[in-house]
C-alpha cells in the first residue's frame, strides 16, 4: 500500500500494459471507492478521472469487486507500485482470524439517486446529501462517562492570548510557507486501486524492500509543518545536543504533566482566577466586541449559582464579581436549555427532527434586569444598567447554523465577513468546550468510523469529503486535528466541525492537532483570518476551545489514533486519560510529542525532529509501542503524502492526509480511512482539483440545494 516501490518498478510495465490490464481484469479489481463521479469530473491529471466521466455517462458499467486482505507478509503489495496494487487481488489470510473477518461485497455500486434514497426515508429521496435528515447512529463512544476532574471546570484564561491587544496592533503578516522541494514526481497515468483492506500480521519482521518513509518510498512526502514558527517558545534543550535533550525529556514526565495546566492554574500557560490580567482581559473584551455577548465564555466556577444568590452574600460583592467576570454569570441547566422548553441532550439518541439550541452565555436572572438581591434600588451600578440595556441574545439553532454554513460553502465565494454573527460563534465555541470537557482526553470508540486527517481550512474540499463519505450522521467520524491555518476558509471549516460535534456529540469526534494552539495559529493564518473577518476576541475564544480538545483515540482497542505520533515518556494510557484540560501545548513532554512527533527510517529509536520540536521515532519504537499496549496499528496525520495515505514499518503505522492539492502547491490526493465493524480498513480518496474545478463542483451542489428548497 505504501509507495516504497513506486520508483523501483521496471520499464516493462508500460502504459499500454496498464490499459490492457484494466480491460482484462475489470472483474478482479478491488473496490475503488474514489468513483464519486460528481466530484471527479474536473480532474485532468489521471486516467482514473476519465473513467469517472465514462461511468457518469453509463452507470451500468460500474463493476463489482472483492476487498482483498493485506498482510504484513505480502511483499507484492509492499514493494509493487500502484499498478501492482490494482492487479494483485489474491487474498492473504493471516492467522489472527478474529481481527481479519471480512466479507466480499455482493452488491453493485448504487447510482446517486438510489444512494440518496437509501440514506433517508422517502421524503429524502430527492434531496442532496447535504440536506438529508435522518436518525443518528448508535453512540460509538465507549467511555462516555466524564473522566476529567471537577477542577477542570475552573475558569481558565490562556496567558498566551492575554497580552494581545484586541485592536490587533501587534498582529503581523503571516510568513509565507517555506518552500519544499518535491521528490522527483513522475507522471503516472494511472494510480490504481485506493481501497484495500488492512490486515496486520503478528510477525514483526519487515519484508525485503519495504523502506517505509525513506526518500524513495513516495513521490511526494512532506511534513505539513516543516519548521516551527519563530514565535513558538522552545526550551534550550530543543536546539542543543540531542542526547541531552532526550535525557531531559525521558525523565521529565512529571514536569510535562505540570506544564499541561494543572487544576491549580499556577503554570506558565494559565492565568489564576483572580489575577489582574484576567480582570483586565474581561473588561477589555467587553468594549471591543460589537456583539451582544460579553466576555470569553470560560467555564463557570463549580457551585456558583447566579440565579439563586446566597442571602448572606452582599449585593455589592455580587455586582463586583459580575463586572469582573461577566461570562461566568450564567450556566445552562439541563431543564432550561431551550426557549421552547425542550431540554438539550448531549446524546445521539435524539431524533434528527429535534432542534438543538445553544443558550447564550450572557448573564441572566435578576441581575440582567438590574434588580439586586436585597432590593436596594440605589445600589445599582453602571455595569448593571449597561447589562439591562443590552438586547438579549437568542439561543442559536444548530440545524439552521449548519445549513447557513453549507450554503456559504456551496456559494464558492470567499467573503470578508463570516455568515454567522460574532455572538453565534461565541455560543458555538462555549457549547463545544462543555462537550469536550465532558468527554475524556483519550476517547475509546467502537467501529464503524471514518478517520480523517489534516483539513487545514480547505472548506470546499471538506464539503467534497462529506459528499463522498456521507454527511453526519450517515457515518461516524474521527478527525485527527489541524482544522485551521494554511487554507483560506479556516473559520467556516472549524465552525462546521464544531456544529456537527454539538449536533452529534457521541458520533462525531475531533482530536487536537499541533495547529490547534495559540502560537501556531498566530503565525500560519488563523489569527489573521479572525482579525480580518471577525475580531481578535473571536480568535481567543477559539483558542480557549482548542485547549479543551481530546488528545488521542483508541478504536476497538486495536487502532491507536493521534495527530503526530508516539512519545518516549508515554508509559501508560492513563497518562493521556488523566491530562487535565484546558491546557495549552507545552514546550516539551507528553502532549507536545503526541501532536508533533514523526516516524523515521533512522536506525536510532528516538532522535531529534528536524521540525525543531519533539522527536522522531523509528520502527523499533513503533513495534515496542504496539506490543506493550496490544495495538495493531497506529493511525496518524501531520504529514503530506502523495496518495492521501501511506503505510510505514510493514503496515504497522499509516499516515492519513485529507487536504487534496494542499495549499494549491502539492498535487496530492486526500484520503479518509474507514474502519468497518470487522476491523477492515479501507480508503476513500479525493482527487486534487484546482480552484476552477472546485468552483464548478460547488456550483453543482448549490444548484442541487436550490432545487431541493423549491
UniProtKB/Swiss-Prot annotation:
Positions of modified residues (Phosphoserine): 55, 71, 203, 224, 275, 310
Cofactor(s) required for function per UniProt: Mn(2+)
Broad enzyme group: hydrolase
Biased composition (Polar residues): 62-77, 95-104, 261-273, 291-302
InterPro entries: Calcineurin-like_PHP_ApaH (IPR004843), Metallo-depent_PP-like (IPR029052), PP1_catalytic_subunit (IPR050341), PPPtase_PPZ/Ppq1 (IPR011159), Ser/Thr-sp_prot-phosphatase (IPR006186), STPPase_N (IPR031675)
GO BP term, example: intracellular sodium ion homeostasis
Phosphothreonine modified-residue sites: 161, 271
GO CC, any one term: cytoplasm
KW NADP (keyword) present: no
MF terms in GO: metal ion binding; protein serine/threonine phosphatase activity
CDD domains in UniProt: MPP_PP1_PPKL (cd07414)
Record field: compositional bias (Basic and acidic residues): 15-27
Superkingdom of the organism of origin: Eukaryota
Lipidated residues (N-myristoyl glycine): 2
KW Manganese (keyword) present: yes
Biased composition (Acidic residues): 160-172
Active site, UniProt feature: 515
Designated name of the protein: Serine/threonine-protein phosphatase PP-Z2
Organism whose genome encodes this protein: Saccharomyces cerevisiae (strain ATCC 204508 / S288c)
Lineage per the UniProt record: Eukaryota, Fungi, Dikarya, Ascomycota, Saccharomycotina
